[in-house]
Amino acid sequence: MLARTDSTNAEALKLAPGLSGSAWVLAREQFAGRGRRGREWVMPAGNFAGTLVLRPQGGALAAAQLSFVAALALYDALGLACGPAARLAIKWPNDVLLNGGKVAGILLESSGSGPGVQAVAVGIGVNLAGAPDAGAVEPGATPPVSVQGETGHAVDPEEFLDLLAPAFARWQAQLDTYGFAPIRNAWLARAARLGEPIIARTGTAESHGIFEGIDDSGALILRGPAGRQVIPAAEVFFGG
């Protein structure tokens, strides 16, 4: 447990060359955390900022599939932390929702590229004690919530890691043993807005349609007016 760091992902990738297996990096305070597309990840005191650094089996695709492993592990850990009354769902590509609001996010970063991916940092942020101000998020984005705010449960970051780490290990073993198919099926069973209208935005386009699922690579499948689209990377917004 680090008292303070700029980014647990950056810290984890510094450790990677000396690792033979995997390791978790956890920080009480993270002052330069990042989300997707370089966005700042705001971390109020008492929240979870952690990274698992590991060497993936395979290249870039296998590394990317760890995002789905992380989402399933978060779903399980949050289920234990929040209790049976909590409504949890996974939002493509990298968020976990609690009672309809964003409670956790995932960011993968790697060293090396293509078939030469040397290490992957699976960064995970969870709003345990508090959520960022809703006014700080992009218009139309899912509003942030916290575990304590939604359930009244006070969960320490180290206690949460005790729930998350074994859950990640279980799902990673599924991926390593059986491939992506069971991970994909489990993810779809927990997916938010499956079969419902969504909006997928890339840097240059916006697509409206029905969220039909994900393909064997984890890409979004959208059924719109022009037919079926497979979208490898985008931001998803609900409604419309």
UniProtKB/Swiss-Prot annotation:
Domain BPL/LPL catalytic per the UniProt entry, residue ranges: 1-176
Signal peptide: none
Matching InterPro entries: aa-tRNA-synth_II/BPL/LPL, Biotin_CoA_COase_ligase, BPL_C, BPL_LPL_catalytic
BP term (GO), one: protein modification process
Gene3D superfamilies: Bira Bifunctional Protein, Domain 2
Keyword Heme part of the UniProt annotation: no
Pfam family membership, one: BPL_LplA_LipB
Catalysis: reaction(s): biotin + L-lysyl-[protein] + ATP = N(6)-biotinyl-L-lysyl-[protein] + AMP + diphosphate + H(+)
Binding annotation for biotin: S7, T8, N9, Q30, R34, G35, R36, K102
EC number(s) from the headed UniProt entry: 6.3.4.15
A GO term for molecular function: ATP binding
GO cellular component, one term: cytoplasm
Keyword field: ATP-binding, Biotin, Ligase, Nucleotide-binding
Broad enzyme group: ligase
Superkingdom of this protein's organism: Bacteria
SUPFAM superfamilies with a match to the protein in the record: Class II aaRS and biotin synthetases
Family: Belongs to the biotin--protein ligase family.
Cross-referenced NCBIfam families: birA_ligase (TIGR00121)
Function: Activates biotin to form biotinyl-5'-adenylate and transfers the biotin moiety to biotin-accepting proteins.
Full protein name: Biotin--[acetyl-CoA-carboxylase] ligase
Organism: Paracoccus denitrificans
